[in-house]
């Protein structure tokens, strides 16, 4: 009989973890790490020669009157290009945007480039309409077919009604 006052007996054999599973997982991790290192090295080498020169030189002054500089940072539609595209520092981008806005207000620059914007809109509209199938409801052949189907349905409905009336009489 078991009573609550009896002490808990420890087993004589200690609890052992299986070391094999742990070692296997370690080995697979090492293998994957080695293959990752192999692929990592050639990418580092290829990036070095593609370093580009910044668009703003050391002598360039960021000002609303410097139109040749400002025009480099405006898109074809007249929008201010992002920092990622311009490759500018945050301070330079802020100064450029302020200069562009100032030039627009003082009418040195248009707010939008309407000629390029119209071409852009025409291209985007043609792309949208080209991908979607159009529904032409006003083609005479389709409307005749639709009307004939509707007439057939109405005729069948009338026949059913007549049959009901006859059966009830």
Curated annotation (Swiss-Prot):
The record's keywords, sorted A to Z, are: Chloroplast, Plastid, Ribonucleoprotein, Ribosomal protein, RNA-binding, rRNA-binding
Composition-biased stretches, type Basic residues, lie in 27-55
Annotated region Disordered: where? 1-61
Family matches, as SUPFAM superfamilies: Ribosomal protein S18 (SSF46911)
- Tell me, what is one Gene Ontology molecular-function annotation carried by this entry? small ribosomal subunit rRNA binding
Enumerate the Gene Ontology biological process terms. Answer: translation
CC annotations in GO: chloroplast; mitochondrial small ribosomal subunit
Name the principal localization, coarsely classed. Answer: plastid
> What does the UniProt entry say about where the protein is found?
Plastid, Chloroplast
| Subunit structure of this chain's protein | Part of the 30S ribosomal subunit.
Record-stated family: Belongs to the bacterial ribosomal protein bS18 family.
Which NCBIfam families is this protein grouped with?
S18 (TIGR00165)
Q: What is this protein called?
A: Small ribosomal subunit protein bS18c
State the species of origin.
Agrostis stolonifera (Creeping bentgrass)
